[in-house]
C-alpha cells in the first residue's frame, strides 16, 4: 500500500502570486547597493541583468542538475552589468535577496494546510524542493509561518545537498529518510521534467498537480493529474502501490 507522499514546494504547496513585486524589490535593492558604490545603471540594464541571472540559473539547473545558490546568481547578474562588488557589499546583497521571500511571501495553495494535516494521519510526508534565490533554511520559515511545517517528517532542499530534481538520487535519499521503498511512495509536483519524470525514474508514482501551473499538462506522464489540492486525499487513496 501507499505509505509516503512527497511534495514539491513552488507551485505545489505555495503559489508565488507576489513574484513580480519581489522581482521589482530585488532590482531596487541591487540599484541601491550599486549607488552606494557610486555606480549608476539604467532600469533597462537592471532588468536585463536580472533576466541574465534567471537564464544562468536555468542553464545550470538543466545542464548540471544542480541549483546554483544566490551567490552564483548574483555573480551572473553583476557579470551582465560588467561589474563586481566588494565582498562586504556582495554578502549583504546576497542576504537581502535570500530573505526577500519572507518580506514578500508566496501564498499557500488553497486548501493545502488542512489537506496536509489530514494526509499526515495516513502517510509519511516530505518536501523535495529545488531552491533558487531562497535557500532551504528560509523556505522552512515560510512553511512554519503558514503552519505547514509540522506535517512533514523530512525536508530535502537542493542547496543543502547539491543534487536537485530530476536526479533519482534526490527522491531515493528522501525515501531512505522516511524508511519506505519507492513503490510505496508518490510525489506531487507541477513540473513534468523534474517532478513527474524524476519521481517515476526513481520508481515512485507521480501525481501531476496543475492547479497553480498547468504549462506541462498537455504532455504529462503523471499517474494522476490533479487540479485542486482538496482532491489529493481521494486521489492518493485510489492510487495503487507501484510494483507492490
Task: Give the location of each predicted region.
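N-terminal helical cap/lid subdomain that shapes the substrate entry/recognition surface
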Residues: 1-114
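Asp-based, Mg2+/Mn2+-dependent phosphohydrolase catalytic module
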Residues: 1-5, 15-17, 36-44, 113, ...
